[in-house]
Curated annotation (Swiss-Prot):
Subcellular location: Cytoplasm
Family, per entry: Belongs to the MurCDEF family.
HAMAP family named in the record: MurC
Residues spanning the signal sequence: none
Domain of life according to the entry: Bacteria
Protein name from the UniProt record: UDP-N-acetylmuramate--L-alanine ligase
Keywords noted in UniProt: ATP-binding, Cell cycle, Cell division, Cell shape, Cell wall biogenesis/degradation, Cytoplasm, Ligase, Nucleotide-binding, Peptidoglycan synthesis
Listed InterPro entries: Mur-like_cat_sf, Mur_ligase_C, Mur_ligase_C_dom_sf, Mur_ligase_cen, Mur_ligase_N, MurCDEF_pg_biosynth, UDP-N-AcMur_Ala_ligase_MurC
Annotated binding of ATP, by residue: 126-132
Native species: Cronobacter sakazakii (strain ATCC BAA-894) (Enterobacter sakazakii)
Reaction(s) catalysed (UniProt annotation): UDP-N-acetyl-alpha-D-muramate + L-alanine + ATP = UDP-N-acetyl-alpha-D-muramoyl-L-alanine + ADP + phosphate + H(+)
Pathway(s) annotated for this protein in UniProt: Cell wall biogenesis; peptidoglycan biosynthesis
Length: 488
């Protein structure tokens, strides 16, 4: 750490001068890697461990971090503090070794809270839309010359990274409710996009517990802070009287403080008007498809307006918005001549959405922007518990596509649950009579099973949160060609 970096670091958090070496267990995760990247750029010595290399670990290695692709006690012994992902179990050898050596072990959100402590924190929470909204706020602040620090759960395409250290007092961060760790954060502004039943194991299956946790999160705001909340969401509308802070509401609803009107979509762009209290209307062109993204933009504009950012900067940022990785991520348009001998093309889009609400939003955006396309979805359910708990909702939304290929459930460490598997879900969807799903038991066969169902005017949605993103990239690299055709 050089003198200049250390001086800057001490000016932000003087007490953290005692910390030299920060070790991350599960460093390859987007949220963990983002915080590690900011701290590396602040001059800390960073190390971490994960099971396999990925784009996040490559980026950190380039910044000088030491990455171990194993979990061993000796990896942590020189650390001042160990940061642990919620995906890591308490019996991990590095965690055990840290406890034995009396090295503090903290969760990711606790370290994020330290980054936020002496900055103007803007935290983005909610069941859906966090990553994109965080990126939109960051883009607007950057366009306005405010040079924010941001820590996002997905790749911010314009920056080519999940996180970036800025030189201003602003820190914009995604706030994760999945393990309730967002309660560590004490932001100045908090966005809540929506609240639905997800990650219910954290909340002991009690939706009231989840709702109260969001209230507690908002009450971490100082009394002069501000909550920015989507009034279209019925749960948020119900909770508004319980929020003892200043509130700005947004949405399509007539009574929203920042109201979306006249929405229309052409291809990948949304066009709409934002009506604000005591401010001129904004006529927005948003470079992201779907009504859900208009809501995300309304949240970002609400925050930017409150900060006093000029309208021109807001409009420029939204029109040039490059999106985030795996959120309606356009991977290319490929001719089918070498795929199945047909004329025409197929567009390939990769999307992380894995909850029925998210999948529905993606399908609606695809239908609105490309109504003439044959909509083909390759879906990988994520977790047996989610598939069980939202089974009917999944069956309904997946019945909306023209062609459905379904991979086996990505377990994310869970044991199989009878009746909550992909074969059962396919059977249920088939019985509804709208679409005849194709079960793909071997991921290596996706391209071969996809080729015959493509018509020559297709939009392929690769959908899910497991390892299906890797399959999307492989399809793009092979230009959709099955392996036996790929070299022909």
């Amino acid at each position: 750490m050089n003198t200049q970096q250390l001086a800057k670091l001490r000016s932000i958090v003087p007490e953290m001068r005692r910390v030299r070496h920060i070790h991350f267990v599960g460093i390859g995760g987007a949220g963990m890697g983002g915080i590690a990247e900011v701290l590396a750029n602040e001059g800390y010595q960073i190390s971490g461990s994960d099971l396999a290399p990925n784009a996040v670990t490559q980026q950190l290695t380039a910044l000088g971090a030491t990455i171990y692709f194993n979990h061993r006690p000796e990896n942590v012994l020189d650390a001042s503090v160990v940061v642990v992902s919620s995906a890591i179990s308490a019996d991990n050898p590095e965690i055990v070794a840290a406890h034995e050596a009396r090295i503090p072990v903290i969760r990711r959100a606790e370290m994020l809270a330290e980054l936020m402590r002496f900055r103007h924190g803007i935290a983005v929470a909610g069941t859906h839309g966090k990553t994109t909204t965080t990126a939109m706020v960051s883009s607007i602040y950057a366009e306005a010359g405010l040079d924010p620090t941001f820590v996002n759960g997905g790749l911010v395409k314009a920056a080519g990274t999940h996180a970036r250290l800025g030189n201003s007092r602003y820190l914009i961060a995604e706030a994760d409710e999945s393990d309730a760790s967002f309660l560590h954060l004490q932001p100045m502004v908090a966005i809540v996009t929506n609240i639905e039943a997800d990650h219910m194991d954290t909340y002991h299956g009690d939706f009231e517990n989840l709702k109260q946790t969001f209230i507690n999160f908002l009450h971490n705001l100082p009394f002069y802070g501000r909550a920015v909340m989507c009034v279209d969401d019925p749960v948020i509308r119900e909770l508004l009287p319980r929020v003892g802070r200043q509130i700005t509401t947004y949405g399509f609803s007539e009574d929203a403080d920042v109201r979306v009107e006249n929405y229309r979509q052409t291809g990948a762009q949304g066009h709409f008007t934002l009506v604000r209290q005591d401010k001129p209307e904004l006529h927005v062109t948003l470079n992201a498809p779907g009504r859900h993204n208009a809501l995300n933009a309304a949240a970002a504009v609400s925050v930017a307006t409150e900060e006093g950012i000029e309208d021109d900067a807001i409009l420029r940022a939204l029109e040039s918005f490059q999106g985030t990785g795996r959120r309606f991520d356009f991977l290319g348009e490929f001719p089918l001549a070498n795929v199945n001998g047909k004329s025409g093309t197929a567009m390939l889009v990769d999307d992380y959405g894995h909850h029925p609400t998210e999948v529905d939003a993606t399908v609606r955006a695809a239908r609105a922007g490309w109504p003439e396309k044959n909509l083909v979805m390759i879906f990988q359910p994520h977790r047996y518990t989610r598939t069980r708990d939202l089974y009917d909702d999944f069956a309904n939304v997946l019945s909306q596509v023209d062609v459905l290929l379904m991979l086996d459930v990505y377990p994310a460490g869970e044991a199989p649950i009878p009746g909550a598997d992909s074969r059962s879900l396919c059977r249920t969807i088939r019985a509804r009579g709208k679409v005849d799903p194709i079960l793909v038991s071997d991921p290596a066969q996706v391209a071969a099973m996809l080729a015959p169902v493509l018509s020559g005017n297709d939009l392929i949605l690769v959908q899910g949160a497991g390892n299906i993103g890797k399959i999307a990239r492989q399809l793009a690299e092979a230009k959709l060609q099955p392996e036996e055709n790929a070299h022909g």
